[in-house]
Amino acid sequence: MTVRPVRRSAVALSAVVAALALAATSPLPSGSAASPLIAGPVPAGTVLHDEHELPDVVPPADIADRDTVSDQLGYARQAASLPVVEPGRAWKNVGPYGQDDPLTYPTGALRFARGAGMGAAAAVDPRDPSGDTVYIGTMGGLWRSTDAGKTYTVLGDGTFARSAIGAVALDPLHPDDVYAGTGISYLTLSGDAPGTGVYVSHDGGKTWSRPASNIKGYGVNAITPTATGVFVGTSNGLYVTTDRGASFRRVALPTNAAHTAPATGAYANWVSSVVVEPSRRRSVTVAVGLAYGKRLGPDGKPLSPGNGLYRSAVGAAGAFTYLAGSRGLTNPEATNDPIGRTSLAYGSSADHPVLWALVQDAGLLNKQQPAGADIVGTTTGRSLNATGTLLNGLYRSDDDGATWTLKATPASLTPTPNEGLGFYPALGYGIGVQAFYNNWIAVDPRDDSNVFFGLEEVFQSVANTGAQPGLGQFEIVQKYWDVCGASTYLENVYAGTACPSQTPVYGGPATHPDQHVGVIARTPKGIRLYTGNDGGFFRQDSHPVRSGRDGFDQDTWQDMNRLASVQPYRVARKPDGEYITALQDNGGGFFKEGGTNTLVTSGDGVFALATSNPDTWYLSAQGAILWITQDHGKTIRDLQPDLVAPQFTSPIVMDPTDENHLVAAAQDVQETVLGPKTTTTLDPVLYTVVATDWASSFDAGASPYKTAAGAVAKWTSQALDVRGAAVYNAMCALCRNALGDPTLIHTTVSTNVGKAGCTPKKASADCWHTAAGKGLPHVAIQAVAIDPTDVKTVYVTLNENSNIGYDKKVVGGQRVMVSHDAGEHFTDLTGNLPRSNARDVLLRNGQLIVATDNGVFTAPRAGGRWSRLGTGLPAVRIYDLSLDKSGRHLTIAAYGRGVWDLDFGAKAVTSSAGAGTGG
């Protein structure tokens, strides 16, 4: 065992546990703070908050490409035109159908309700008086339910060229007309997906068409039917159809700094919300709300100089003007760039339109200090750092946007007892910390002072928040997670303090954090709120709450998550036929075919590694945290490496020839040959690695490249593979630059193979070096696979999404490449493969198999001529390929549609599947 110097941020885990225990065991009066203050950053291994790979990095490049729709549609059509290998073999969706968090497993104490994949969009059918007919959009497709989420019919499969749904709407003038906007654009690396435009159905979703005259843009953020047409807000501006979806045309908005003409920047017309005044349904208001606001782009110009509100009183193209009242969407706690992502909603007051706005602060995302910083910290207690909060505030206008009244700020939104974000501000997080990612608002159609909005949690009014001045009062009705249960979770995993009986004091389980959509349906007895978040969809019918007011509570939410919509980064089939999963924002777990996933670990699941023992497997979370279970998930043990500067998805792999041999990498490469006997000792107070059996084999250190500001860029691992003693580490420099940094990224491999006169050894520094990597393009490597017949031959797949602002001819369009000299030189095998993201690669019986954003493809070792593998896959991104120990079952991670399996019915010699970054 090697004793390690302390590298990570020091914080007393015991203080976290003590605070959790105090918050959990001390009932608090209504309106009081939920927990005592805790000093310091979040403990390195406390994976209870999903960071979404941080917003302050380069988002996918094709967001900025106005031809994204054309590109993605072209990729899909090219994929569909390729011949099919194994045409008689169909892919099978094996599940999981939702996810449970039972108390008998380590994370059960967190008390999450049954969940699924991210809920991104929703619309109710106004013709159904029961409120039960609802359309929901996820990362993996569109579904309709006529029984409030008990059962579903999937829509659009076979027609949607990309199935991630950013918005859905029904036209009340033509109720059978359904509009589905593909593409989700939150400006995160894990939560975004490019689309192929808007699809239209005229029969309630039974059949669909894609108008040739369509939108251009990465994602669809809003679809709003009006009396004059259906407006679509996208990442590339505003569009409208006036012929029931037969065609769409661009609507000009005066988004330059003077508001006299459209701004020309790639991000300058990012429409985050579109609403129509409810009485006549003609006056249309649009929020241009790029989360980054006026941050300078690679060309030195503001990304979005005209964030704010725009209106056409007649709902017509060519009639939109800047709404001067936008300047009122600020307050002393906001920065000088106060308008970022904005959500709008109208109330239905009988005598005048009431407009609400939930506004993210672009300046805070760009790490500016609030304009009134002299009072911050003395009157509000608000953190000035970029992780404290990103929320500007909640506003109400009683004159249709001419003036605004501030109704809530991050400081005024107080947590409730046993609610997870109650102690986060002291750890560097605050309410609204992800307002660029979590941001929606809805108004009670019976009372325009009763408002509901989603950030990390869902809030509702608890007192009249009408036209009178002063801040309103709000309470949380969907909590982040259960503080009392988190204490027990820490006790289970990290020797914390167990929580006593909690239900009598704190009520029912949490649904899930990170709220994306909320819609209201009328019911015979009141209203129903449908919400979508990173854990799926939930519903609740209104009932008397505070002082008889009709609303919602934390305890009676009903899940709607009996569908296969989880978003796996990694999957593996165990010898007993069960599957283990690593899921976006839903941890790691296991399930049987056709069953429900059982949650075992928390955070973002990143890697899942199966062994020959069906009761022993490994699960990892963001930041290279690694656990092992040896009793089928009932208990887990921490055995993480002590990597230098681990990334969100730093790779961890297992040697297919020796499952005791594990390799992990970030800036450095570490190995262990002890498998389940590997131990890692953590400081009980600081939660840092003080001793471990992991040995450092190689530290790539500084690259020869610099950022635009002149800082030396460090190498960091993007992907790994191992076979015997041979290890390849795909490295990247400048892969995660800030948005305004125009520097090209660089990539290569380091390895212990190919050094003259040197024989590689497991867990040894011998022979390690950085290969030349000649021929590699300026894009990130996503996966590595060693040829099982020749360890000097290595295959890589590459990512499309890099280098914003650069011509693709400069960065390179290669997606699959091979080196036959241990990484010194690479040649292109892409051939006729669609040039979307290629995410994973393996070999089976001498055939290459590649996972891409357009499906699974195969070709001979020499590449070039690719075919589709099998039939029946949905149009979603495939993140991972995994062969079971026999080589008979190929299992894939279909992002947004769960786990799929192809049964070859024969054994095979294989390579390891490699391990990339998952995105």
Range-by-range predicted roles:
Residues P36-A908:
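Beta-propeller blade termini and top-face loops
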Residues S14-A24:
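Bacterial N-terminal signal peptides
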Residues G905-G918:
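Low-complexity, Pro/Thr/Ser/Gly/Ala-rich linker/spacer regions in secreted
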Residues L22-A39, G916-G919:
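C-terminal region of N-terminal signal peptides and the immediate post-cleavage residues
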Residues T2-V16:
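N-terminal export and membrane-targeting signals
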